[in-house]
């Protein structure tokens, strides 16, 4: 059968793999090739016809490597095809050798051939081109970018392994081209030596034919399926040779070449027997030419049937492949649809996210607006607090002014009292205690005696104000005004004092003086006639006045007590004047009334401050509640 028919059985699928996996695959394939070549084909290296077969394999490998060097997927499949082609060539070596002619020279040294005498990797590595390539590779690998190598190089039967080359990719630089180049050179040299030895070596064939009857080695083809990450299997064919173990060959091969790598899944295929007649290799004389066996009609029909079956199988495989491709296409369409659906979902999600973002922006704007409103409210609150503070300060200043006025009034009152005391001490002669007469008329005037009196006494008696009693209809309960007191204090220091009494009917000082003079004349005439009666009643009046004064001293405890106070004027009649004791009592009453008034004012001020604080706190609470709402 042809090589294309044998290759038709292989069903390879291209898959993507990483560079490290690609390197491992190529290294394993090359090791299998070395193992098969040295174990099965080492004895035929002396035959010159091997060069054409090897060159054919070289051409396939070089073309595939040059065309598919940059594509890792195609490179993987091409390596598998190259391996199968190489194995097919090995299977048909016997049939091809049958057409060459005599093989006496091949069988002559069969028992003496060892792997150590054949071409080895030491010769390849020690050659000029190989050594230069290795050194260049080492220079590249020993740059600072690569990690240091800690392993020491080891040598076994002049063969370097990949660990001796400091990097697992180094073997790829010469494992195919250099090895096959050296193999060609060795084959050419062996061809010349075989042609020279064929003429002299004619008697050794009979001895080899009688002694060596080894059957041809069966080749067991195993298919290993390696699963990659994307769960697409890659077919990797390697021919593993099962041969009889001889002491020499087994020891040398085990030390020279590593054992083949094991795969995860192995599915054995039926053994294929080579179409070669063992007698054509080992039992024929050198003088008889080797004639190929002619196939019968039955065998040809069987082969045709087999080819038809294979074609049917191929068609079935193609249909299966088409179905698989359709399924794969459907899966791809479904995956694309799912991807589009996911993209739409992502777009909707992005739209929702943008909507949420806009909502957050609106919330932020609202929050900023609320914050600005709160800030304005706080500003208004600060303004109100400032206004309240101003009002409070104004009230404080007003109270301070009132206190100052009160203190000034007190000082003035003290000054007036002191001046009155001084004038009394200076002007009043030492006489007995006078009798005081009280008048209940609303407009009482001081009486003037008929006899001449000193001007000072007349002036002082005219200074005492006439205050109406509560019994009169037009009378009102009042205290002496500050204006009256100031008038009194202003008129005291003058040498000649004139009476300036303030009455409800008086409009000017002149009218007041005229009224006072007329009243004095009238009262003087009446007093002249009633002088004796008044003298008799003076003692009683004095006693009554003393009792009234004693009662009035204990009377002023509350502001309501001022209503019952009777402001009785102290008048002078007929050389009688007000006693100093009575004047002091009257001053004490006035001072007590002032103190009571000050207490009432202070209490009112305290109540006002409490009310203001309460109102301010209520206002603040109402503002805080409104801002929270």
Curated annotation (Swiss-Prot):
Biased composition range(s): Low complexity: 247-264, 434-464, 493-554
Span list, region Disordered: 1-24, 62-87, 197-464, 493-560
Any GO MF annotation of the entry: histone binding
GO cellular component labels: NuA4 histone acetyltransferase complex; nucleus
Biased amino acid composition, Basic and acidic residues: 294-430
GO BP term (any one): chromatin remodeling
Segments of skewed composition (Polar residues): 1-11, 274-288
Top-level taxon: Eukaryota
Protein name: Putative uncharacterized protein DDB_G0271982
Alphabetical list of PANTHER family matching this protein: PROTEIN CBG23787
């Amino acid at each position: 059968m042809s090589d294309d028919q044998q290759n038709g059985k292989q069903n390879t699928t291209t898959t993507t793999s990483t560079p490290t996996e690609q390197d491992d695959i190529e290294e394993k394939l090359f090791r299998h090739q070395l193992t098969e070549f040295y174990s099965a084909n080492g004895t035929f290296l002396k035959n010159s016809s091997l060069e054409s077969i090897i060159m054919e394999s070289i051409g396939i490998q070089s073309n595939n490597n040059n065309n598919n060097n940059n594509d890792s997927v195609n490179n993987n499949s091409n390596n598998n095809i190259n391996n199968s082609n190489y194995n097919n060539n090995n299977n048909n070596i016997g049939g091809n050798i049958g057409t060459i002619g005599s093989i006496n020279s091949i069988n002559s040294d069969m028992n003496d051939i060892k792997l150590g005498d054949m071409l080895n990797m030491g010769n390849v590595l020690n050659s000029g081109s190989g050594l230069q390539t290795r050194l260049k590779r080492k220079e590249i690998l020993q740059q600072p970018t690569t990690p240091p190598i800690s392993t020491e190089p080891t040598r076994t039967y002049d063969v370097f392994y990949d660990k001796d080359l400091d990097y697992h990719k180094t073997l790829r630089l010469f494992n195919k081209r250099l090895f096959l180049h050296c193999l060609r050179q060795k084959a050419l040299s062996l061809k010349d030596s075989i042609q020279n030895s064929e003429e002299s070596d004619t008697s050794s064939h009979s001895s080899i034919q009688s002694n060596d009857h080894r059957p041809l080695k069966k080749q067991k083809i195993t298919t290993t399926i390696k699963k990659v990450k994307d769960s697409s299997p890659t077919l990797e064919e390697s021919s593993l040779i099962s041969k009889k173990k001889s002491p020499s060959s087994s020891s040398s091969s085990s030390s020279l070449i590593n054992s083949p790598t094991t795969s995860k899944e192995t599915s054995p295929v039926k053994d294929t027997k080579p179409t070669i007649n063992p007698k054509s290799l080992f039992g024929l004389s050198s003088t008889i030419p080797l004639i190929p066996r002619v196939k019968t009609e039955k065998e040809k029909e069987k082969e045709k049937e087999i080819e038809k079956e294979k074609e049917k199988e191929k068609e079935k495989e193609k249909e299966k492949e088409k179905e698989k491709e359709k399924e794969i296409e459907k899966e791809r369409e479904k995956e694309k649809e799912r991807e589009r659906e996911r993209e739409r979902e992502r777009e909707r999600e992005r739209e929702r996210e943008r909507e949420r973002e806009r909502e957050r922006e609106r919330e932020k704007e609202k929050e900023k607006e609320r914050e600005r409103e709160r800030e304005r409210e706080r500003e208004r609150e600060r303004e109100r607090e400032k206004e309240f503070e101003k009002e409070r300060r104004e009230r404080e200043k007003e109270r301070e002014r009132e206190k100052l006025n009160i203190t000034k009034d007190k000082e003035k009152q003290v000054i007036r009292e002191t001046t009155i005391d001084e004038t009394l001490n200076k002007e009043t002669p030492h006489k007995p205690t006078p009798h005081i007469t009280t008048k209940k008329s609303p407009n009482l005037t001081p009486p003037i005696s008929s006899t001449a009196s000193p001007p000072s006494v007349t002036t002082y008696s005219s200074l005492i104000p006439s205050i109406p009693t509560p019994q009169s209809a037009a009378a009102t309960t009042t205290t002496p005004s500050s204006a009256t007191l100031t008038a009194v204090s202003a008129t005291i220091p003058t040498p000649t004092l004139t009476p300036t009494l303030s009455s409800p009917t008086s409009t000017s000082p002149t009218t007041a003086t005229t009224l006072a003079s007329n009243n004095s004349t009238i009262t003087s005439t009446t007093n002249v006639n009633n002088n004796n009666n008044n003298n008799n009643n003076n003692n009683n009046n004095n006693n009554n006045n003393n009792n009234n004064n004693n009662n009035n001293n204990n009377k002023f405890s509350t502001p309501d007590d001022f209503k019952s106070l009777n402001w009785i004027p102290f008048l002078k009649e007929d050389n009688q004047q007000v006693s100093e004791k009575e004047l002091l009592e009257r001053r004490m009453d006035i001072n007590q009334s002032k103190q009571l008034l000050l207490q009432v004012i202070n209490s009112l001020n305290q109540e006002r401050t409490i009310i203001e604080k309460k109102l301010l706190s209520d206002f603040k609470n109402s503002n805080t509640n409104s801002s929270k709402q």
